[in-house]
Amino acid sequence: QAGSAVLANASVLVDGAAASCPAGSVRAAVAVNAADDLTAWSLADDGSISAVSGAYDAGQQTYAFDVVNGVTAIARFPFTDVVAGTWYYGAAAYAYNNGLFAGMTPTTFAPNATMTRAMLVSVLWRLAGEPAPKAPNTFVDVPDGAWYTDAVTWAAENGVVSGIGGSRFDPSGFVTREQTAEILYNYAHSKGYDVSARADLTVFPDAGSVSGWAEKALSWANAAGLINGTVRDGQTILDPQGSASRAQVAMILMNYVEHVVNA
């Protein structure tokens, strides 16, 4: 996916040959002018390509990145439907660069597409390092071998999700804003992060429409700066049952890592 836009590459050599090393153990940097649209890629021996951690240092005007699995390349952000200057551009680049989001196609991010429950759980699974589930899948609508099966199974066994009843997860269902808050809260709690912050949701005119099971999580998510109000008909509302776009969730996840994971 890096294609012809590769700007630089780096590798760890042992006796003249590229060698693998654990993620985060070797860091390199290259001089660049600006880097919101740069991403770091690891090229494995089998030819597969995966995103690795990288970040732009504006002060040094360098792009630092992990060197893993032999050769790591620096390439331009590949999505043609994520335009520089849009409110979600940095979040989409961050989520993609850190391996949290995949594109809908090699060149399409689909920022306005609605996030599904399977997509959100898969993002958190990647954030957790893609751990192998220890328990069997118990959801009747999550087939073996689907791209989200391991993520959903892991999330269920760790209390991140509990399904919608009747042994169903509804992987293709659109995730709502209050469901997003609940899932993020459960993930943070399972990792031992501080989830004590609370906001007064009554400042929003539709606070009464928040489901009882989501009140604590949405109050925390609002206090943590993850889910804020959205403007509709001149009013700032919570819109708890409203859906969330991929661009919105990318922004939420970037803030989540900054304000919760790295707090």
Language model regions located:
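Short, surface-exposed loop motifs enriched in S/T, G, D/E and P with embedded aromatic residues
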Residues: 50-58
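Exposed aromatic-hydrophobic patches
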Residues: 29-31, 62-67
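C-terminal, surface-exposed recognition/capping segments
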Residues: 40, 212-225
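Ser/Thr-rich low-complexity repeats and stalk/linker segments
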Residues: 37, 48-51
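Proteolytic processing hotspots in large secreted/extracellular or virion-associated proteins
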Residues: 1-39, 43-44
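Feature responds to low-complexity, polar/acidic, surface-exposed segments characteristic
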Residues: 53, 64-89, 97-98, 102-151, ...
